[in-house]
Amino acid sequence: MTALRGAGHLAVALGLLAAAPGTAEGAAAGPSVVKFAFGRLPDGTTVDRYTLTNSRGLQVEVMTYGATLTAVKVPDREGRLANVTLHLDTCGDYVRGHPLFGSVVGRYANRIAGATFTLDGVEYALTPNAGKNHIHGGRQGFQKIVWEARPVRSDRSAGVELTHTSPDGHEGYPGTLSVKVTYALTEANELRMEYEARTDKPTHVNLTNHAYWNLAGAGSGDVLGHVLVLNADRYLPADERKIPLGELKSVKGTPMDFTEPRTIGSRIDQVEDRNYDHCYVLSKKDGERLSLAARVVEPKSGRVMEVYTTQPGVQLYTAKGLSDRIKTGGVPYGPYHGFCLETQHFPDSPNRPTFPSTVLRPGEAYRHVTIHAFSILEPHGPAER
């Protein structure tokens, strides 16, 4: 795999999507940001949604509740647009509860064993919300917050900047944490997510986006035929609670191996519970520099998504437990109807000193970037530019 050469340039060609049939009409003259009122919480708080559009016809929608990605509309090789991220229809649907579709999760993405950690000699008790463990920031994590938002736009991108201040002690975490998440849709057909945070006390931070992807289009069926490559030759074995055992194990000779292209479902029957929910250790040569983490191809539509990140790990989740009670446009979702590639630090790092540190101290800045780059795979050739 080839690493990203720079913040705005991909090592692989991106599709000339605006030229495809059905995409040029209505495309913006340049990057644009439009704000809409999306709904209200039961307490009357307004929830807004921002629509980002580039000149090539791609469209991204983000709402302020949970800093949630609600749409990524990408054409297939015939120019037909589809929303490739799983979503719900109304603000009320999200508020009533959902499996974190497209939400920013924090303060700590993934699991912390025993809902506790010790930092600088002080033990902190977090809210247990996964049995006795803590997951995705607790019962009132960032996915249930209405974020402040403002549009950001340049000649090369359309974006929205979302901010939130998490008070000292929220869900048990020390320190007042100031967080900024920026989504930007670029003219190069990249969805760029930037995460920043600062604290006034030592704390742990691990942020990600929990988008579920289906490159055939949300609601179209399962993703087991998607072809996946992960730039990871090791993963973290875990116990039955999905808490890492502490070792970094080779994927070679196991159904965890996606170092070469293979369909997601090709060996899922050999995985415990027939479901991937595992953290992979990315093969990075340059520490936290932006590099390629994953490439996914949906053969029928020709859609390609590449994921670049500064993070050391990525959680692959194949959503076996997705309920058919959850619907979009009246169409029920179901098992394996989406996959997640959650770029992040490792689960339970606060209790594993050998894992990359997630400690953030006053005066330091937490900064990470993840990019999703979209293109079209020609039937007999590389992704078109």
Question: Residue locations for each model-derived region?
Answer:
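Bacterial N-terminal signal peptides
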Residues: 8-19
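Cleavable N-terminal signal peptides
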Residues: 13, 22-27
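N-terminal secretory signal peptides that target proteins for export/translocation
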Residues: 1-4
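An exposed, glycine/acidic-rich loop-and-rim segment of catalytic or binding clefts
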Residues: 26-385
